[in-house]
């Protein structure tokens, strides 16, 4: 019997990628503006802004592999990947939401940016790994298409809504995204059930 992709579950899982794409699109659009203002009279301002904006890339090559590997070895009552999502996404939402509140102080904003990047690193790799964990091997290509669609929708939402909210108040895009991340965390906890044994992982079950 041919197995079919569970589209409702896959779209639900895609909310994690939706949140990631939304938050990073807003981050990359508006954080340089905040930095440009707070570093207005600083020598080598452009270089400093460029360096600060690489924090997520530094986290991507250092922290994300660590948390991804750690989630491979995790299993408890919350699942394998879900503990990292439940811990990281709300923290990421909190620190993301407060970034614009500290935009007049470089030290405070840097603290929020670093904390946000650390929190995002906790759940990003486990979120990516969750799709193949809950999807049969033959259906993973279809599921990946759904996931990428959800990520694209998150980026589009940032593009169409972010600037409008920013024009009302620079903090609104960040608060909006933070609230969505909290809601998405709750939805993922409610709707996604991880299997203890992963089908077809590396040619053998985990």
Question: Can you describe what each PLM-predicted range is?
Answer:
Residues 2-57:
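Helix-loop boundary and gating motifs at the non-cytosolic
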Residues 18, 92-123:
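Hydrophobic core of transmembrane alpha-helices in multi-pass small-molecule transporters
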Residues 33, 37, 100, 155-173:
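Transmembrane alpha-helix termini and helix-breaking/packing motifs in multi-pass membrane transporters
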Residues 49-74:
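Central cavity-lining transmembrane alpha-helices of secondary-active solute carriers
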Residues 60, 141-166:
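Glycine-rich segments within core transmembrane alpha-helices of 12-TM secondary carriers
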Residues 81-97:
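Structural signature of the two symmetry-related core transmembrane helices
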Residues 171-190:
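Symmetry-related core transmembrane helices of the 12-TM Major Facilitator Superfamily/SLC fold
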Residues 188-201:
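Helix-loop junctions on the cytosolic side of multi-pass membrane transporters
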